[in-house]
């Protein structure tokens, strides 16, 4: 199945089964704005809980805050967002559509990479166990040609971005023959800058109002609270401050479902450390965050690091953790060494001293910062894309199953009375009433047992418990496993123990410790 077709099916599945809806749907929606449905919000909350506990529970020196979306406007001047938070935009004169020039070029680089991947996959299929991928990549003329073009384009693009050379970005687009996906033409305008922050007015009247911004990131709320947290928590370096919250960016090219939106949610942690130790902590957090992802069991081969060649104005090192989505490897998390830029800027613009007194060195200094920043929505999409599976069964039928990491599944257990009579629904409800205090449990009695299994498969429920006539006599039930469809008879008294051991967030946290 083509990757594009797979992605369309995943988007459709999300709406059909209550994961994601187009926002304002009865008004024909609002472009690139989505609402999370009853199953989507549970999955999203489980992702956030997993992240929060991995930060705050596993690290005694990391605490959390929840800062305001509206902040003093000078904060964004100090952080550089007012002057430097821009995207290079280009318009197609025929379609009247606007695009990010850098994204058009990155997509072109991705096309070269995809050609190489297809050549490798074709050869692997042809030669089987005797296939030497490394040798094939080093010797195959077509692969070498695609790789040469990819490397040359990447080098040229990186130089243009580093120099903010908009004329060169446009020339790259023209030289590569990049066409507008709607009009199919190359009739491009010049490239220009566009600030990504949403602004609004705060005040009782237009004359007395103050221009403020919807925050484009949650990080600045952490930086301006550094002293508040450090002093009230009696925190000693190194320590971290974690936060989960909404951020807003006026993306011109919002696309690929929930991957790139104008309203999104971030999970960020700023780790404050002694100057000179930042690269040691940068390395630590790279590996620790990768372990967090890999503990989900979505295939270590689906992750890779992408080190930045062009660094943001605040960073001295940066890398992305990328995940293999249907449209290529894309960033799901960034790890950055932000130096002391942010704290120094806020000290300068606020006129307040933002220093840490180190009792061991008997001196004041501005801490350096390592940031980990992950998009909740991108993580949600990664989990959905990896989990969506179409299976052909031995009996000739098929099923769609979401093989979600069990700890993240919206519903952990569905209790299904075999028939909706003879005291079975009442017995099923008794089981639900016992299990619901430990993990999310539902009851479903409508339709045949086979159809109910398929519905639970489609929303990723790891366990189904079938209550039948024998249950009333011996207090045993049939426990069905989602991925294998294996069924076994178990006592009701053991249900909680069997299921909880596999679906708790604790089981994931232990895997992180094992990987570290």
Where does each model-flagged region fall?
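NTP/phosphate- and nucleic-acid-binding module
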Residues: 1-516
């Amino acid at each position: 199945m083509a990757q594009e077709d797979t992605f369309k099916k995943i988007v459709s599945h999300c709406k059909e089964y209550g994961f994601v809806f187009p926002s304002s749907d009865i008004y024909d929606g609002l472009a690139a704005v989505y609402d999370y449905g009853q199953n989507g919000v549970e999955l999203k909350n489980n992702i956030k809980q997993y992240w929060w506990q991995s930060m705050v529970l596993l690290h005694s020196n990391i605490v959390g805050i929840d800062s305001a979306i509206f902040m003093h406007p000078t904060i964004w001047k100090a952080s550089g967002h007012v002057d430097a938070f821009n995207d290079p935009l280009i318009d197609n004169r025929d379609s009247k559509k606007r695009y990010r020039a850098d994204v058009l070029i990155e997509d072109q680089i991705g096309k070269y990479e995809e050609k190489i991947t297809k050549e490798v996959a074709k050869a692997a299929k042809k030669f089987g166990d005797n296939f030497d991928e490394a040798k094939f990549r080093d010797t195959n003329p077509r692969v070498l040609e695609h790789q040469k073009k990819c490397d040359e384009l990447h080098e040229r693009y990186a130089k243009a971005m580093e120099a903010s050379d908009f004329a060169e970005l446009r020339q790259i687009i023209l030289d590569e023959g990049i066409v507008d996906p709607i009009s199919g033409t190359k009739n491009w305008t010049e490239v220009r800058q566009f600030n990504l922050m949403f602004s609004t007015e705060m005040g009782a009247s237009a004359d007395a109002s103050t221009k403020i911004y919807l925050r484009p990131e949650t990080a600045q709320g952490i930086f301006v609270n550094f002293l508040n947290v450090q002093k009230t928590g009696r925190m000693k370096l190194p320590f971290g401050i974690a936060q989960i919250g909404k951020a807003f960016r006026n993306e011109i090219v919002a696309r690929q479902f929930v991957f790139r939106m104008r309203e999104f949610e971030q999970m960020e942690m700023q780790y404050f450390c002694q100057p000179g130790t930042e690269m040691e902590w940068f390395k630590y957090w790279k590996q620790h965050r990768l372990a967090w992802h890999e503990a989900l069991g979505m295939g270590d081969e689906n992750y890779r690091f992408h080190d930045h060649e062009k660094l943001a104005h605040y960073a001295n090192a940066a890398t992305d953790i990328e995940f293999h989505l249907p449209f290529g490897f894309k960033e799901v998390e960034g790890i950055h060494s932000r130096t002391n830029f942010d704290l120094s800027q806020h000290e300068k613009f606020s006129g307040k001293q933002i220093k840490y007194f180190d009792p061991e060195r008997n001196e004041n200094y501005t801490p350096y910062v390592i940031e980990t920043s992950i998009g909740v929505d991108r993580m949600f999409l990664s989990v959905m894309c990896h989990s969506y599976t179409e299976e052909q069964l031995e009996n000739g039928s098929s099923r769609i199953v979401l093989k979600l990491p069990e700890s993240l599944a919206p519903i952990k257990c569905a209790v299904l009375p075999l028939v909706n009579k003879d005291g079975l629904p009442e017995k099923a409800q008794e089981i639900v009433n016992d299990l619901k205090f430990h993990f999310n449990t539902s009851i479903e009695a409508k339709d045949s047992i086979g159809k109910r299994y398929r519905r639970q498969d489609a929303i990723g429920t790891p366990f189904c418990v079938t209550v039948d006539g024998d249950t009333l006599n011996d207090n045993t039930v049939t426990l069905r496993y989602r991925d294998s469809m294996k069924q076994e008879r178990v006592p009701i008294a053991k249900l909680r123990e069997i299921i909880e051991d596999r679906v708790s967030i604790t089981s994931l946290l232990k895997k992180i410790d094992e990987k570290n």
